[in-house]
Swiss-Prot record:
Xref: Pfam families: FAD_binding_6 (PF00970), NAD_binding_1 (PF00175)
Source organism of this protein record: Mycosarcoma maydis
Enzyme class: oxidoreductase
Catalytic activity: 2 Fe(III)-[cytochrome b5] + NADH = 2 Fe(II)-[cytochrome b5] + NAD(+) + H(+)
Membrane topology designation: Single-pass membrane protein
Main location: mitochondrion
Protein known as: NADH-cytochrome b5 reductase 2
GO annotations of cellular component type: mitochondrial outer membrane
Amino acid sequence: MFIRPVLSSSLGHAARSSLRSQAPAVRQYATEAGKSSGGSNLPLVLALGGVAGIGAWYGLGGFDDPKKVSNKIQEKGKEAVDQAKGAVEGGALNKDQFVEFTLKEIKPYNHDSATLIFELPEGKKPGMGVASAVVVKAVGDGLKDDQGKDVIRPYTPITSPDTVGHMDFLVKKYPGGKMTTYMHSMKPGDKLGIKGPIAKFAYKANEFESIGMIAGGSGITPMYQVIQDIASNPSDKTKVTLIYSNKTEQDILLREQFDQLAKKDDRFTIIYGLDKLPKGFNGFEGYVTEDLVKKHLPQPELADKAKIFVCGPPPQVEAISGKKGPKGSQGELKGLLAKLGYQADQVYKF
């Protein structure tokens, strides 16, 4: 049993748990200078222009020892260079430094999820590729872990990379989750430190004939990014099948977008799974089984014409495809997909 909503090319830029795997004794739940001459730089500072130049001079030390002023100028210059290096061309993000963005609005989504809309500078896009991620942290000393270190977590926006003026995150609040609890407590006008992008899988149109996706809970967000990109490009002929599992029907994220456009584009098949199916719900119940994957996802025999994406809580990822390696590496392919004969280069773990 499955639902086959199809996504329209009109999705464009406006649209954008408990996954379980049948594995032995495993049940997972869907629930981050220039060289100095040593001389005085006073003429250079004053040459910056009028009052602004004098103000800059005072800001750098005024009548202090010329060497101190020179050192301060070099420090400021290095800081500006570092910022320029990290800035993504034409984008609001910086991959090397946290930039503070202001929360414009927070929209409740369901009983435990909300969409947080952050303002970008006027006319700016985020400056990231499809399915890229960012890391976030509270500003100042707002949120620390048990060791006193900043809590930093990764997130994937649900807005497309071409969205101008704002960047949206759909955040599910998990019990005991420090960052999700913090983000849900934010109010319009509050700021959040965001750094990125972190490059993930570099999707290219028509690179594969078929893509299979297995997601649980908030692991839907990178999948949605890829789906948005394909749906907005009529020339991309890639077929996509998404298996998306949650605890209850109310936990399904972005369902409105999927269902609203379900009948308009046969490139997409969406298969919902729940712990227990309510009466009349079209989907599968319980585990993601080998038979389910065999029936609906592109098979290993397609070789480099197929790709399988996996995203969700660590227990889910481990059961489906083996856990990720250190420092964000892919790690060894194990779990259900390995058992079915998929090769490591056919699978990507977000």
